[in-house]
Amino acid sequence: SPDTKLKGHGSGHYMSAIAQAYAVATNPEQKAILRQNITRMVNELRQCQEKTFVYNKDLKRNWEARDFAPEAELRDMKGTWAAFDEYKKHPELYGYGYINAIPAQHCALIEMYRAYNNSDWVWAPYYSVHKQLAGLIDIATYFDDKEICDKALLIAKDMGLWVWNRMHYRTYVKQDGTQDERRAKPGNRYEMWDMYIAGEVGGMS
């Protein structure tokens, strides 16, 4: 949908559906169509993901999730649709492995404890990531083309690395103190995952 920040959520369900439908289909024509759709989905997702594979000469490594949106930039980051239209023009900034139907800023905004607001802030970014990972894993589980199955797992692995890299280097856990104290610095997972709808930590568990 063009006007929901749960973008990617539906494509994850779609991948799960076509993978499971393929596994039980008996009609050769239907099975051929499903095969074509699965193959196209995986190949095009990988092409999109590869736009984030950017080597940084200064760092002498790939640009990673931890490098995306330094704190000063994060604090000023906007969540409007107009801002998102600008963000999506630069996938090379997202960090190695990011793949989603919405810019990486959507995941980063929750580190600033931005509330659920479909127009101006966030709506369960990691929940949508989870749905896409689940869809890719279902393809790898139910499809019978090894090359495509391996590619689906590779996409999921690289996105998983993005999540790990971002969480490991840019977030932490602080449970004590007042909420203002716990939110004084960006990236406190104790607060991030406790936000109604915006967080939805269960989506990634």
Locations of the language-model features?
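Glycan-recognition and catalytic cores of secretory/periplasmic carbohydrate-active enzymes
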Residues: 1-205
